[in-house]
Structures are given as C-alpha cells and as structure tokens.
C-alpha cells in the first residue's frame, strides 16, 4: 500500500490488481479518485466485492462471468468496462477465450441482454518465454482479432478501443504490436511478495 501511495503522490491515478481480496483492501485505504483495473483471474463469487468501485475488468473469460458482472453492476446502477481475455499463449495455465470462442460469443451476444457492461476491447498474455519471435507472433495474432472485431461486431463503436497486452518483461514488443494498455508491476514495484 505504501508503494502505491508513493506512486499516487507522484501523479499515477490508474492502478491494476490481480487479486480480488487485495484489491478491495487497497481500495478502502487509498484515495478515492484512483481508477482501479482488475487484471487477474476472477471468480464469479468475487465480482460482488469489486463491483461498487471497479473501473475496468481485463480478465473476462466466460459468458457466465460477463453475466455476473452485469448482475452486480446493475445492483449499483453503474456500467462496468470489461475486456475479453483471449488465450494466446502456449501455456495451458493461462485463461481466456480462444479466438473462435470469442467470435462465437460476440456474434451471438445481444447488447441489450447485458446493459450494465461495456465491452471495450481485448486482453491477452503472451507465453512466458525469452523467445521474442513467439511473443511477437502471439501479440500480432490478438491484434489481428481485435482489428477484425473492430471492423465487424464493433464497427462504429467508439468504446471498443482497448488492447491490453504487455507486462514488465514484454511490453516493448506489445507496444510495437498495437497495445493500448500495458500492465507494469514488477518493473515499478519489484517482485511481488506472496
């Protein structure tokens, strides 16, 4: 919390957190004008805890989770921005929709069915590797999907504009491949203590 307060004092206003319990604890003690982004795996039963204040959820990986976010946002009469997580990495441990699952969801989703969410883009995590060509290819693939959706399902939708990809170890590649939002933690705050 002290490191976040220090970053806040230096002018930072957008913060991401990958654990729901830690996010709610930090939100209670840090300044109220912080724009909180949730960037980790999210379970449906955790949505109610972050719904009152969360700005953007980067890690939507199922229709069930989308529906729960909509339900909890409705209880607070607010719209929550979401990004659909796309599984682009070689690792099985990573979460997200396959590109085909994403297309199927979006082509069949009626926006009026989820009035309290706003789909603003996609999020992806590349394979954790030193192979920069593999990382570049994975980011390139998600950017192609983003462009395809921007020109079809979201044609004319000014809100569908975010491509969240790139972390401390691979953000330069992500930026070159079209990222609009990078998630930097380790490079600023050091290794996380679990």
Where are these regions (language model features)?
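Conserved alpha/beta-domain cores
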Residues: 1-169, 175-177, 189
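Gly/Pro- and small hydrophobic-enriched strand-loop and loop-to-helix capping segments
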Residues: 179-194
């Amino acid at each position: 919390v002290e490191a976040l307060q220090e970053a806040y004092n230096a002018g930072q206003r957008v913060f991401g957190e990958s654990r729901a319990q830690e996010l709610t604890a930090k939100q209670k003690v840090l300044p109220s004008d912080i724009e909180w982004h949730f960037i980790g795996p999210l379970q449906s039963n955790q949505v109610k805890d972050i719904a009152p204040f969360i700005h953007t959820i980067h890690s939507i990986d199922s229709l069930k989770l989308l529906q729960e976010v909509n339900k909890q946002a409705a209880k607070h009469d607010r719209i929550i921005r979401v990004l659909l997580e796309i599984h682009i990495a070689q690792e099985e441990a990573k979460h997200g929709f396959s590109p085909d699952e994403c297309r199927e969801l979006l082509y069949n989703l009626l926006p009026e069915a989820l009035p309290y969410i706003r789909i603003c883009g996609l999020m992806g995590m590349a394979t954790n590797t030193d192979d920069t060509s593999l990382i570049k290819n994975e980011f390139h693939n998600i950017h192609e999907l983003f462009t395809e959706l921007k020109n079809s399902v979201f044609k004319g939708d000014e809100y569908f504009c975010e491509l969240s990809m790139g972390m401390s170890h691979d953000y330069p590649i992500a930026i070159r491949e079209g990222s609009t939002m990078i998630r930097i933690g380790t490079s600023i705050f050091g290794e996380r203590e679990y």
